[in-house]
Amino acid sequence: MYLCLESLQKSEFANQRWSLVDTSIETFKAPPENTLKKRGQHVTVIYDQNAMNSMVYTLWKEVYYVDETETWHKTSSDLDYDGIFYIDNQGNKIYYVNFQDDAALYSNSGMGQVHFESKVLSPSVTSSLRVGSTGGQRGTQTGDHARGRSRPSPRSSRDARGRQQRAQSSSRSRSRSRSRSPTKGPHSSGRDTRLPSPGRPPGGRRRGTPERERCPGTPTPPTPDQVGGRSSTPKRQASSRLAQLIDAAYDPPVLLLQGAANTLKCFRRRATQAHPHKFLCMSTSWTWVSKTSPLKSGHRMLIAFSNSEQRNCFLASVRLPKGVSAVKGALDGL
């Protein structure tokens, strides 16, 4: 980071106004990585037309980067239905956020709506959040967009899907009526015999099942004894929301203690000596920075446990010092 700022100081952008946030390592490593950026704005992608199922990304209005000749360039970001990108000095479109990456994780249909400022981008017939497509640099587009055709409106897309569904339903009805025509033999009665269709019980009407069918590849839910029994971060992969919730149920439980710094330090020493088998690990005392509320004052200390039973045993057998409070929680990993 020091070498980057030293190079920036020798460039034509050295006299611009730079804040500590603009030149922090966190901003430098945020997408697009290894670049300086300013004026970030939020982009919201809503999946499956459900406002509760959405992701928020950052679009940077100003992006500063260094090319192969150690020359600094300034550009701006833009977005389309595929993701957020900027144009480099060679005219290449560089995507640093691909919406389909998270669509594979959070969307059932692989499609969503992109909301930015006053614009709403919806999928067209030939464009969608393509699950499994490669990310990175893209210079050309295929399909109707390459030929300059305009996208159909969301309403026309819904009408087309409705006509297609009605046509499929009508075709299925005709095939069922042909298969149900009575064929009487010497031993047949006056009532025609119908074979139940796949997935339907006899009688023709679909009945509710006592248990929800699990999709192939969905992991087995943990037992109560297994909840909180893992201390590593779940592997990020494309799976259903149910599979992610089951995977996260193994997250290790923790206790967050709040109190005076010296009180927490003494308690950690006593607990380590007297009750080392009743917890997994303890942190040092720490405080929140950039506090926006007086409720976040005071020192904190985290205690991690192997499972919920160990945490319950700790609370039942270890007495907290006076003035120390505890709240329960869980982490993705330790």
Swiss-Prot record:
Disulfide links within the chain: none
InterPro entries linked to this entry: E2/EBNA1_C_sf, Nucleotide-bd_a/b_plait_sf, Papillomavirus_E2_C, PPV_E2_N, Reg_prot_E2, Regulatory_protein_E2_N, Regulatory_protein_E2_N_2
Post-translational modification: Phosphorylated.
Location of region: Transactivation domain: 1-127
Alphabetized SUPFAM superfamilies for the sequence: E2 regulatory, transactivation domain, Viral DNA-binding domain
Compartment annotation: Host nucleus
GO cellular component assignments: host cell nucleus
Comp. bias (Polar residues): 229-240
GO biological process: DNA replication; DNA-templated transcription; regulation of DNA replication; viral DNA genome replication
UniProt keyword list: Activator, DNA replication, DNA-binding, Early protein, Host nucleus, Phosphoprotein, Repressor, Transcription, Transcription regulation
Disordered: annotated segments: 127-240
DNA-binding domain: annotated segments: 251-334
GO molecular function: DNA binding; DNA-binding transcription factor activity; nucleotide binding
Self-association state and partner proteins as the record states: Binds DNA as homodimer. Interacts with protein E1; this interaction greatly increases E1 DNA-binding activity. Interacts with protein L1; this interaction enhances E2-dependent replication and transcription activation. Interacts with protein L2; this interaction inhibits E2 transcriptional activity but not DNA replication function E2. Interacts with protein E7; this interaction inhibits E7 oncogenic activity. Interacts with host TAF1; this interaction modulates E2-dependent transcriptional regulation. Interacts with host BRD4; this interaction mediates E2 transcriptional activation function.
Functional summary from the UniProt entry: Plays a role in the initiation of viral DNA replication. A dimer of E2 interacts with a dimer of E1 in order to improve specificity of E1 DNA binding activity. Once the complex recognizes and binds DNA at specific sites, the E2 dimer is removed from DNA. E2 also regulates viral transcription through binding to the E2RE response element (5'-ACCNNNNNNGGT-3') present in multiple copies in the regulatory regions of the viral genome. Activates or represses transcription depending on E2RE's position with regards to proximal promoter elements including the TATA-box.
Family: Belongs to the papillomaviridae E2 protein family.
Name assigned to this protein: Regulatory protein E2
Source species of the chain: Bos taurus papillomavirus 4
Gene name of this polypeptide: E2
